[in-house]
Structure formats: structure tokens, C-alpha cells
């Protein structure tokens, strides 16, 4: 059985860091940097208006010094437990950026160590664009298990892996059927 309509995770109708898509739980985005492991990357996550659209804007300087190299906007997918996304084919994100490459990191109940995730890269051009990332194209990172879509826990939009200036805005995040 497949879903017939997208599952909206965030449409930026909220003026703060919390998603408010009208579902039963409103989760809040949070900024995570490599400072949790001794890195020196610096980031900010704040609501913004870009080219007429409300969005969250992830900005900062990513530095690979001290074994670092990331800043991330992270969203827990279900406050009540784990989210079952088996009836969806992937994640759709409306993005506006600075022509850099960013990552989507998806975590589930099997990703118990902080660096484990399922990943895909995407370009964020300096104009609004909808990016579709099929679940089938997510690559496991430091985990041997295939992606179990029935137990999703968190997603992250990440500037990672190289020295760079991050400037990524996202206005809508959903699972698509």
C-alpha cells in the first residue's frame, strides 16, 4: 500500500524553530555543530524571509579543524516515538541556497551511534527549488543494516565534510508518495 498524499513535516507556517504542519505533534528544529566533538564550526539557525517565502535559514562557517566539519539543522520526526514512512517513496524539500552541496541525513532506530545515518547529497541553487530525494538512493554511512523506513527517528539538513560557508534556506519538508 502506498500513500496518496504527501506527509507534511514542516511548511514554515510557524514563526519560530518549531514545525507546525497541523499534525498531532509539533517538533522543533535545532542546530547541531561539530562542537559536540571538539570541532570549531560555527552556525546559526533562524527563521527568515527569502525571496518572498518563510523559511528556516542555516548559516555558518564549516571548518575541518580539530576533526570537525559540520553544522546541521535537525528535526525529530515524531515526539511520541518512531515514524513509519513505508508508504512513502522519499523526502521532498524546498530549498534556496548559495550553490553549495548539502546533505540530507536520516536516522532510524538502528542508528545508535551519533555518526551513523543514511545520506544523500543535493545542490541548493540561489533560487527556490524543490529537491526530491528517494529513500532508495540514501546511502548507509557507518552502518551495515539496510534502511528500515518503519522506524524513522530524525532527519538533518547538513553542511558537511569541507571548509565552506553554509547558507541554506528550507521552506517545506515532506515525505512524498
Predicted regions and their residues:
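Beta-rich carbohydrate-recognition modules and glycan-binding surfaces
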Residues: 1-177
Amino acid at each position: 500500500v502506498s500513500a496518496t498524499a504527501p506527509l507534511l513535516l514542516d511548511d514554515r507556517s510557524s514563526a519560530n524553530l518549531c514545525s507546525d504542519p497541523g499534525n498531532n505533534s509539533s517538533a522543533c528544529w535545532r542546530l547541531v555543530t561539530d562542537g559536540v566533538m571538539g570541532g570549531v564550526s560555527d552556525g546559526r539557525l533562524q527563521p527568515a524571509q527569502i525571496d518572498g517565502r518563510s523559511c528556516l535559514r542555516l548559516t555558518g562557517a564549516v571548518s575541518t579543524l580539530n576533526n570537525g566539519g559540520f553544522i546541521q539543522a535537525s528535526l525529530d520526526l515524531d515526539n511520541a516515538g518512531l515514524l513509519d514512512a513505508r508508504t512513502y517513496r522519499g523526502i521532498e524539500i524546498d530549498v534556496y541556497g548559495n550553490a553549495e552541496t548539502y546533505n540530507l541525513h536520516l536516522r532510524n532506530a538502528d542508528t545508535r551511534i551519533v555518526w551513523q545515518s543514511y545520506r544523500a547529497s543535493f545542490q541548493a541553487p540561489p533560487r527556490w527549488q524543490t529537491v526530491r530525494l528517494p529513500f532508495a538512493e540514501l546511502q548507509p554511512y557507518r552502518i551495515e543494516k539496510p534502511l528500515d523506513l518503519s522506524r524513522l527517528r530524525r532527519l538533518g539538513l547538513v553542511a558537511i565534510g569541507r571548509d565552506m560557508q553554509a547558507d541554506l534556506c528550507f521552506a517545506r519538508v515532506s515525505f512524498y508518495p
